[in-house]
A protein has these predicted regions:
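N-terminal glycine-rich FAD/FM-binding segment characteristic of electron-transfer flavoproteins
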Residues: 1-165
Length: 165
């Protein structure tokens, strides 16, 4: 990438895919996913300045309906249309061909920060959660109550999304 080329050319460190940057004791601390997205780590650069790529919030719609592997496109679209919400999805839904990449939320997609985020059939992989973690209220709908999406949800419904409409 361009950022990696610039960092290498200048002999500087690069922290990619950051979800947060903050200053402490005169140092910049970058937070990013690690361990295949299962955890987060704070990175303190040994070089100055620090180069970083950061997930920017590209969607701040009032309400977003987001579909994962466990929800069909028709159900998600119907709900989004009914409540006048933006429609997004997880990487799994893109990989299955249900949605275009432009709809993908997460580390390899876009970051969103709506007032309300409705996750339909989304497991809650850290790669997805880091793209929606700054949402106001999170409502998770998934028949498997052990899915990680419930860990970051304000409200949870253990049911198939199709059964709610």
């Amino acid at each position: 990438t361009v950022a990696a080329f610039v960092a290498a050319s200048l002999g500087l460190g690069l922290c990619a895919d950051c979800t947060n940057l903050r200053a402490e004791n005169g140092k910049i601390i970058a937070t990013r996913p690690v361990n295949s997205g299962r955890d987060y780590a704070d990175i303190i650069s040994r070089t100055s300045p620090l180069l970083a790529t950061v997930l920017c919030y590209s969607d701040t719609d009032g309400v977003i309906v987001s579909a994962g592997r466990g929800c069909d496109k028709q159900t998600a679209t119907k709900l989004a249309d009914k409540i006048n919400a933006a429609l997004c999805c997880s990487r799994a839904a893109v990989d299955e061909g249900k949605f275009p990449y432009a709809c993908q939320v997460g580390l390899t997609g876009k970051a969103v920060a709506p007032d309300v985020y409705i996750a339909l059939g989304i497991s809650g992989a850290v790669q997805h959660v880091c793209g929606m973690e700054n949402s106001g209220t999170v409502i998770a709908v998934n028949p498997d109550k052990s899915e990680r999406i419930f860990d970051c949800a304000d409200y949870g419904v253990t049911e198939k999304a199709e059964n709610l409409l």
